[in-house]
Amino acid sequence: MEQQLTLVLLDSPKGAKYVETFEEAASSSSSSSSSSVPSCTDHRHRTFVKFFLYFSLVALAYYFIISSLAVSPIPPTLPQSSPGNVSSAKCDLFTGDWIPDPTGPLYTNVTCRHIQDFQNCLLNGRPDVNYLFWRWKPRDCDLPRFSPSQFLASVKNKWWAFIGDSIARNHVQSLICILSQVEEVEEIYHDKEFRSKIWRFPSHNFTLSVIWSPFLLKSETSSNSDIQLYLDQLDHKWTVQYPKFDYVVISGGKWFLKTTIFHENNVVTGCHYCQGRNNLTDLGYDYSYRKTLNLLRDFVLNSTHKPLVLFRTTTPDHFENGEWNTGGYCNRTMPFKEGQANMKTVDDVMRDVELEVFQKFGKGFGLGSNIRLLDTTGMSLLRPDGHPGPYRHPNPFAGVKNKSNVQNDCLHWCLPGPIDSWNDVMVETTLNRERELYDLTG
C-alpha cells in the first residue's frame, strides 16, 4: 500500500516551486517455503516473527494514515461540545488567540488563480512564510477549520453576496481560493471597472457576488470635485439585488475618512475633512458612518426579504512610523499577543459606532433575527504580519537605494493569509444562527 501527500508551499518570483512530499508505504511480502522440515521450536519462532512483523506493519500503516489526515484538509463534522469546553453556539468566537498551525493554508498561490496581484505576497517575493502557519482559536471553544466541500454542499442553489470596498473583495477572493480547491468557479459577470463580479459554481448551482459599494450609500464623484454622499439613500447598486441573496456579508471601511460632502433631504448639511470650504460644518466621519449603519440596519430589519446578514466590523491597519502616503510600513513577521496592540483612534471610533448600532438590541438582535455581527476586528488587530507591506509589487526593492521610498500596503491581506480565518468564524456564525432557529422551531 502506498500513499503520497504533496503540499505546495509557494511559488518564488523566479518560478521555482518548493514542495514538501510525504510518503507513506507499507508493504508485505510472502515468505518462500523452505524445502527442509522445520523443527517445532523453529516453527513456533517463525510463527511468532511472522505475527510480530504483520502486526507491526499494520500498526505502522495505521499510524501513517492517521498522520496524513492531520495535514490533509479533511472536512470537519459539525462542532460538538467536548468535556470542559463550551459549545460554539454559546461561545464568543471573536475573543481568542492565534496559535501555531503546522498544517498551513487550504490553498497556495500556485493552486489558486484568483489572487489579485497586489495580495500575491509570495509571488511578489516576500521571503518569510511563518505568517501562513497560524490559526484562530477562541478562548472557550473549538473552532472547526473551514471545509470547502461541506460549505459547497450546504449552499447548493444558494446565493452569497459580499458588499463593501476592497477589503470585501479581498475577503471574497480568499473564499473563492478555498472553494476552488473542490470545484473551479466560473466568472459570469463583471462591471466595466472589474470591481463588481458574479461567479458560479456549476455543479452546486451556487452563486457568489461581490458588489463594489464602499459607502453602502448613494454617492457621486468626479475627477475635479469632492465626493457627494447622500446620507438618507442606500446605494441602489446593491439594494435592487438584495431580494436575490440568501446570505449577505456587508461592511464599511476607510472610505468614510475621505473628503465628503453630506446631503440629507436634498440639502447639503455638512461635510467631513472639507477644511471649511463653502462655509460647511465639518461633522466628522463618525457622523456619516453612524447615519449609514442606522439606515442599513433599518433597511434589513424592515425588508420582507430575510437573508442572513452578517455585518463585518472595521479592519484595522498596521502602518507604523507613518501612514500609507507618509512612509508608513509594516515589517513584522509574528502575530501580536493580547495587550501588545492598540487600536488607532479612527478604528476605535468606527468600531464604537458599529457596536452602538448593531448591539443596540442585544447580542445578535435576539434569537430569530436575521442580522449577526461578524466581529473580526480583534482577531485582525493581532496580525500585523499578514499584510503585503512592500510586496504589493514584485521585487519591490530591486534597484531602490532608499527602501523607505517603497510604498507599503498595511491594510489589505496577503493571500493566503490571516484573512482566510475570517471564513472559519463566518461559517460558524452562520451555523450558530441555524442552530438557534432550529431550537426556536423545535
From Swiss-Prot:
Pfam families: PC-Esterase, PMR5N. It is found in: Membrane. It comes from the Eukaryota. The keyword Acetylation does not apply. GO terms for cellular component: membrane. The chain crosses the membrane at residues 51-71. Keywords: Membrane, Signal-anchor, Transmembrane, Transmembrane helix. Coiled coil: none annotated. A motif (GDS motif) lies at residues 164-166. It is a single-pass type II membrane protein. A motif (DCXHWCLPGXXDXWN motif) lies at residues 409-423. Its main location: membrane. GO terms for molecular function: O-acetyltransferase activity. Contains 2 motifs that are conserved in esterases, but it is unlikely that this protein belongs to the catalytically active pectin esterases. Belongs to the PC-esterase family. TBL subfamily. May be involved in the O-acetylation of mannan. May act as a bridging protein that binds pectin and other cell wall polysaccharides. Probably involved in maintaining esterification of pectins. PANTHER family: PROTEIN TRICHOME BIREFRINGENCE-LIKE 26, PROTEIN TRICHOME BIREFRINGENCE-LIKE 9-RELATED. This is Protein trichome birefringence-like 26. It comes from Arabidopsis thaliana (Mouse-ear cress). The gene is TBL26.
